[in-house]
Amino acid sequence: LLEESPHIFIKVLRQYGALKPLFPELDQLFGVKYRLQNHQDFDRGYGALIALEKTAKLSQSGPVRFAVLVHSLEESIIADRELSSKSKRLDLRVSMLKSLCDRLKIPRKYRELSINFARHYKTFFLAQQLEPRKLLKLISAVSDKSSTCKFENFLLCCEGISRDGQRDDNEALISGRYVRSAINIANSVVIASPKRDGLQGREIGQEIQKLQLAKLTEFKKNFSGR
């Protein structure tokens, strides 16, 4: 995955029949069709390789490239299962990815980013439609107040999969701008003197969340996209 063209490695594995025994979840994506924005049908396996190829041009990070490659493994068996809700589909996606990571003993950094990305990328692309409480939950999951690295890696993954033909190339940039602004607003909330305000223990966290929700509500009303 750290080579200049990691998608070629996957192609060669499949060409010589080695992908199926090593990565059956990925191999099963080939032959599964999805509809492009131009209404043409396209193969999910090749879509994953295109996303990987373009992600490799965005980032040299192994965890980012891996997360993009395996973000939608459930699509290989989705047609064979009764999934009555988005939550069941999400559960399947995450459980398949966890099984792959366990079986292949995937390094921790790769595992954490890929699972977090698989769990939240669909919500990310709907960020502007989320009510404040769900928006706060999303930014808490994809960012870390002590470091920008977690969110930047997540955003790189989003940019990578937005180039597979299913989404507009600008979709990740628009959602990224919105979520980044929301993160900055949420992180700006502080309580200077909890004792003076009569707060202690869990009350401090609850008050911070209350203030964050109020600021995010105002943010949603006024966000211009600039």
Regions found by a protein language model. Give the residues of each.
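C-terminal subdomains that position terminal phosphate/3'-OH groups for nucleotidyl transfer/ligation
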Residues: 28, 45-226
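Long, charged alpha-helical interface segments
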Residues: 1-56
